[in-house]
Amino acid sequence: VSMANNPSLQLLMVATLKGFPFHWRMGAENILLVSVGTGMSKWEKIPQKVSKQNLLNWASQIPDMLMQDASWHNQAILQWLSNCDTRWSIDGEIGDLADDLITNDPDKKGLLTYLRYNLWLDAPTLKQLMNKDYTTKQVDDLVEMSNADSRFELYKIGEAAAKNGAQVNAT
């Protein structure tokens, strides 16, 4: 795991920058970058829970906060640069960046074609995808990266997401 979390932007840099040996030409017609995520959790803390947290609770959550922030930052940059049919809403201010494409191209094709497939690991999304209810504990267990016991359920979720286009929550 790196701070990139979603390594797509790093891969684009390796493929195109002069310091690396590949020197691919930029352009939506030249580069198709497909990124497949592993699922992600939502940070939804209600005020009562937050006010009851101690420093140790907060410290244990910092790695996930940093990884999610890095992933969303990379996602925003790639959507900003690209022709992207799988745009995700980044936040309430910038949305999905569909109207903010960086290019001088009058056709607005972008500097690459980028696709991001991922899904929220939350009870409503999982119910829709798997046609069964998940408790808060079950969802928490799925999200916990070090919980090897979840690997079989995560595999089933991944298969179902692939069959459904992995666009359960993309906008």
Predicted regions and their residues:
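C-terminal helical/tail subdomains of lipid-metabolizing enzymes
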Residues: 3, 24, 28, 38, ...
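Hydrophobic, mid-to-C-terminal alpha-helical segments
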Residues: 12-53
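Hydrophobic alpha-helical segments
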Residues: 5-8, 56, 60, 155
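Glycine-rich loops and low-complexity Gly/Arg-rich segments
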Residues: 19-22, 57-61, 141-146
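Active-site gating loop/helix substructures
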Residues: 1-17
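Short coil/turn segments at secondary-structure boundaries
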Residues: 6-9, 45-49, 129-130
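Short, low-complexity, polybasic intrinsically disordered segments
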Residues: 45-71
